[in-house]
């Protein structure tokens, strides 16, 4: 049976202590034979609403902490890059380089990521027609010398795409489940269940969110039939330094993931 991709971890590296506490609680997913697990956290949140918002420890210290997670827990690592000159250094630690949604069309960034040995996760911009994500995927594939396109070509060459909602007026996002089907023509699809419930700028200088919708939307995405899920999670989301309002509490993640595995099995059995 094909493994379900699961990407999970705190939004940003708040401290090594917190990262290790979260990783300790996520290690069972890493040991699950039905899950392809990636630990996620950011060394720098370069697109915060306010200049006063916490951004993280920065590249050098952040990579040291992520490497320590890899060494201690044997986990694969996913983290995002915001500038082309970060790609090579980050790929020495990260197994997956994530392209932020706002930057999903930035050719230089995509090319820099493609030139590394890492897989590439492209988050679809909140502004983007889902069918247009194929052009971002092609930038990575063609940089890697791959002229073929479509799901199989992307899967074989370590490229996947993530849905994280579409702008719906000011300060709100909605999820069009049709986009999951459309994007899966071009690459394996990850559903970012936590950013999809974000309310950009709604907290006055920072983003709000509706975390009560994380699990229902994840279940709906699983029923569509996709490749994996992305959850930002925290021991205490109310105290998180970034994206707390849309995070899923660690205490809820296990049951949520088990439900998603059950739904995926039903979908596979009935195809």
From Swiss-Prot:
Q: In the UniProt record, what gene is named as encoding this protein?
A: kdsA
The family note in this entry says: Belongs to the KdsA family.
State which pathway it belongs to.
Carbohydrate biosynthesis; 3-deoxy-D-manno-octulosonate biosynthesis; 3-deoxy-D-manno-octulosonate from D-ribulose 5-phosphate: step 2/3; Bacterial outer membrane biogenesis; lipopolysaccharide biosynthesis
Q: Which Gene3D superfamilies match?
A: Aldolase class I
EC number(s) reported in the record: 2.5.1.55
Q: Name one GO molecular function term.
A: 3-deoxy-8-phosphooctulonate synthase activity
Key word Transferase present:
yes
- What reactions does this protein catalyze? D-arabinose 5-phosphate + phosphoenolpyruvate + H2O = 3-deoxy-alpha-D-manno-2-octulosonate-8-phosphate + phosphate
Q: Where in the cell is it found?
A: Cytoplasm
User: Single GO cellular component annotation?
Assistant: cytoplasm
Gene Ontology BP annotations = keto-3-deoxy-D-manno-octulosonic acid biosynthetic process
Q: Which NCBIfam families does the entry link to?
A: KDO8P_synth, PRK05198.1
Alphabetized UniProt keyword annotations:
Cytoplasm, Lipopolysaccharide biosynthesis, Transferase
Judged by the first EC level, this protein's enzyme class is: transferase
Question: What is the recorded name of this protein?
Answer: 2-dehydro-3-deoxyphosphooctonate aldolase
């Amino acid at each position: 049976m094909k493994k379900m991709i699961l990407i999970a971890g705190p939004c940003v590296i708040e401290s090594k202590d917190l990262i290790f506490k979260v990783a300790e609680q996520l290690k069972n997913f890493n040991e699950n034979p039905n899950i392809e697990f990636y630990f996620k956290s950011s060394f720098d949140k370069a697109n915060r609403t306010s200049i006063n918002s916490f951004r993280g420890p920065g590249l050098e210290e952040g990579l040291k902490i992520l490497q320590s997670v890899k060494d201690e827990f044997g986990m694969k690592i996913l983290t995002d890059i915001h500038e082309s000159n970060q790609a090579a250094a980050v790929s020495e630690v990260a197994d997956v380089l994530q392209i932020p949604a706002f930057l999903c069309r930035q050719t230089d960034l995509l090319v820099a990521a493609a030139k590394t040995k890492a897989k590439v996760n492209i988050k679809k911009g909140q502004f983007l027609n889902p069918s247009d994500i194929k052009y971002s995927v092609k930038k990575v594939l063609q940089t890697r010398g791959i002229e073929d396109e479509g799901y199989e070509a992307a899967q074989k060459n370590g490229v996947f795409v993530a849905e994280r909602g579409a702008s719906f007026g000011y300060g709100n996002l909605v999820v069009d489940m049709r986009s999951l089907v459309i994007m899966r023509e071009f690459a394996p699809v990850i559903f970012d269940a936590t950013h999809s419930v974000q309310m950009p700028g709604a907290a006055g200088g920072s983003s709000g969110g509706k975390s009560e919708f994380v699990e229902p939307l994840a279940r709906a995405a699983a029923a569509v039939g996709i490749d994996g899920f992305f959850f930002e999670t925290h021991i205490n989301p109310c105290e998180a330094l970034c994206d707390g309002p849309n995070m899923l509490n660690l205490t809820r993640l296990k049951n949520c993931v088990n439900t998603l595995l059950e739904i995926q099995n039903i979908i596979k059995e009935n195809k």
